Regions:
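Rhodanese-like catalytic fold shared by cysteine-dependent sulfurtransferases
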Residues: 2-10, 17-37, 52-85, 94-129
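Start-of-domain marker
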Residues: 37-43
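Short, surface-exposed ligand- or partner-binding patches at beta-edge/loop junctions that are enriched
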Residues: 89
Length: 129
C-alpha cells in the first residue's frame, strides 16, 4: 500500500511540475526536489559548467555542455531529446538559469537546480570525479 502511495505521489509531483510549463518557462527546484526528479531514468541530466569544472566533479550520469560555448544551443539540440525533460545545473545557479531559458525557448521541458552544484555538494549528495 505504501509503495502505491509513493508511486502516486511521484506521478502527481511530475505531472504538476510539467503540466503548466509553457515554451520559455522552466522550473527552479531545491536540492531535494532535484534529487527526486533525477532518480527517474527518463530525466536527462545536464551539467552546463565548463569542461574543467565538470572534470573536477559532477552529478553522476550527467552530460556536459558548456552554456558559455557559442554553439551551446546547437550542441544541445544534437545531444538532448526534446521528448524527455532536462534537469540541469551549474555551480551556483546563475549559468543554469541562462541555459534553462535557452532550452525552454527551444521547446525543452526544463528543471533547474536553483542553488546549483555548490548546494548539491553541501547537502552531501552523490558526486563523481
Amino acid at each position: 500500500m505504501k509503495i502505491n502511495s509513493l508511486i502516486a505521489g511521484i506521478c502527481l509531483f511530475f505531472s504538476s511540475l510539467f503540466s503548466c510549463q509553457q515554451k520559455g518557462d522552466f522550473k527552479s527546484v531545491s536540492v531535494e526536489d532535484f534529487s527526486t526528479l533525477i532518480a527517474n531514468p527518463e530525466i536527462q541530466r545536464l551539467d552546463v559548467r565548463t569542461v574543467a569544472e565538470y572534470s573536477e566533479s559532477h552529478i553522476p550520469k550527467s552530460i556536459n555542455i558548456n552554456v558559455l560555448d557559442k554553439t551551446f544551443a546547437e550542441i544541445a539540440d544534437s545531444t538532448l531529446q526534446k521528448d524527455k525533460p532536462v534537469a540541469l545545473y551549474c555551480r551556483s545557479g546563475k549559468r543554469s538559469k541562462k541555459a534553462a531559458a535557452i532550452l525552454s525557448e527551444k521547446g525543452y521541458k526544463v528543471i533547474e537546480l536553483g542553488k546549483g552544484f555548490n548546494a548539491w555538494q553541501a547537502a552531501g549528495k552523490e558526486i563523481e570525479h
